[in-house]
Amino acid sequence: MKHNIFAVAIIPAKTDSTRLSKKNLQIVDGKTMLEHSIEYAKNSEYIKDIIVTTESKEVEEICKNYDDVKVYKRPKHLLKDAEVVDVYLDVVQEQFRIYQNFNVYHKMTHMVGIQPDHPDRTNNIDDMLDYFVDNTYDDLFTVDSKGTRNGSIRITKAQYVRKGTMSKRVGSMLDDCTNVHSEDDLEQAETNILRGRSFSG
């Protein structure tokens, strides 16, 4: 590994989607989008801990297939249209206090937010973390081919997430993946994965 990184992945996986029912549990290339995200995180050498935040028993059952994945019950006020950054902050600032005995909270150098509805993401997460450190960023988010933030990946220095303060040096990286909102999007994402045009889990 190029850098001394102890990253924690947070995967938001609610099931109260409005446009596509139980979106994060939709199947793409034989796996739910949630499973793609978990396995994407597990392929990283830098990510040492994975937490799925959800209100769903169904999601919890899927996570039981992965011994090293923790599940955090998402509070009701962070369902519906809550900002995903607030979901990330909630996990780090509240849930991580439970794990202090395991030193995860203190060891963490970076938080990696992985949204499941981008199953055909095109970047290797460890390459992104190397890019983040090499460019001395405090915060990094992915954008689509038009330069619009797409939410696929969000990397933030742990010190900012712990304190809930604003980061200063912000960067972006292209991730020309599918932002799934419909059945057509599911088909497009699967096509991209089958063509080998992704770092899918």
Regions found by a protein language model. Give the residues of each.
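Residues at the starts of beta-strands that form the adenosine-phosphate
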Residues: 6, 48-50, 110
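Conserved core of the sugar-phosphate nucleotidyltransferase
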Residues: 82-90, 94, 106-110, 115-184, ...
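Short, well-formed alpha-helical segments that are part of the catalytic scaffolds
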Residues: 20-43
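Short beta-strand/turn micro-motifs composed of small residues
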Residues: 13, 54-55, 115, 143
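Conserved SAM-binding loop
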Residues: 26-27, 52, 113
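N-terminal nucleotide-binding beta1-loop-alpha1 segment
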Residues: 1-21
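Conserved N-terminal catalytic core of the sugar/cofactor nucleotidyltransferase
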Residues: 36-106
